[in-house]
Amino acid sequence: MSKAIVKIDEFIKLSKSEEVLPSAFTRMKSVRVSTVDKIMAKENDNISEVDLLKGVKLVKNGYVCLVGLVVSGEWNLPDNCRGGVSICLIDKRMQRHNEATLGSYTTKASKKNFSFKLIPNYSITSQDAERRPWEVMVNIRGVAMSEGWCPLSLEFVSVCIVHKNNVRKGLREKVTAVSEDDAIELTEEVVDEFIEAVPMARRLQNLRKPKYNKEKENKNLNNKNSIGVSKPVGLERNKVRSVVRKGVRSDSSLGVTDMSQDGSSSEISSDSFI
């Protein structure tokens, strides 16, 4: 069913023999089409994991190239509803937000269904592919729907190439040029007044930011508490010296515990300042 939805020749330029002969006798035997993976978008500014290689048998200790994918959307709304959506494909391995955004698409809710394609065209190891490195960020705006309902359904099908060795396969992939500064931006023609004001890379940065700040705040709080409990070694030693100077015998009857000379009780790890 997925192969009926996706036309491989839209992503890979086939030779005459590859169009006629069975794939087992050509280089097309390494090309795979995934089964459909679905996402039900219920929340605004939500990041969901997507399995772009669903149903694809990977090569052990090999590689997989995500040549391209087709994304189809269906609005679960009455006709002529206001609002719209921005959809962004993310590689969650990447830490720089402009490099993590592989491509985005914007459309209005009045367009009942839509479909678009992206061409990432890069390879990852089979081991990384099993960890599902791709996510989808969905930003629904201006749709007046009560919480808990699903205004939008998304389906994903990908075309990929699996291979054992990281050597050029000879397949001439259709590559879309991407500038160094910006990711691929696709926008439906019907979009006029619905304009995406915030770049997708900046939106992704804002979504990731609260989680990082919360973890940092908790870490600093724990370090602060641990510093307050420990007693400075120098103060304890000064107390002992003052008792001896007054002529009081410093034996076990004083109840003074012997402290280690390395002062480990008040030592602060450099990790506390990270």
Curated annotation (Swiss-Prot):
Pfam families: MP. It is found in: Host cytoplasm, Host cytoskeleton; Host cell junction, Host plasmodesma. Residues 250-274 have a biased composition (Low complexity). Coiled coil: none annotated. Keywords: Host cell junction, Host cytoplasm, Host cytoskeleton, RNA-binding, Transport, Viral movement protein. GO terms for molecular function: RNA binding. Transmembrane segments: none annotated. Its main location: host cell. Residues 209-274 are annotated as: Disordered. InterPro entries: TMV_movement, Viral_movement. The keyword Cell membrane does not apply. It comes from the Viruses. GO terms for cellular component: host cell cytoplasm; host cell plasmodesma; host cytoskeleton. One of its GO terms (biological process) is transport of virus in host, cell to cell. Belongs to the tobamovirus movement protein family. Transports viral genome to neighboring plant cells directly through plasmosdesmata, without any budding. The movement protein allows efficient cell to cell propagation, by bypassing the host cell wall barrier. Forms a ribonucleoprotein complex with viral RNA. Binds microtubules and modulates microtubule stability. Can bind double-stranded DNA. This is Movement protein. The lineage of its organism: Viruses, Riboviria, Orthornavirae, Kitrinoviricota, Alsuviricetes. The gene is MP.
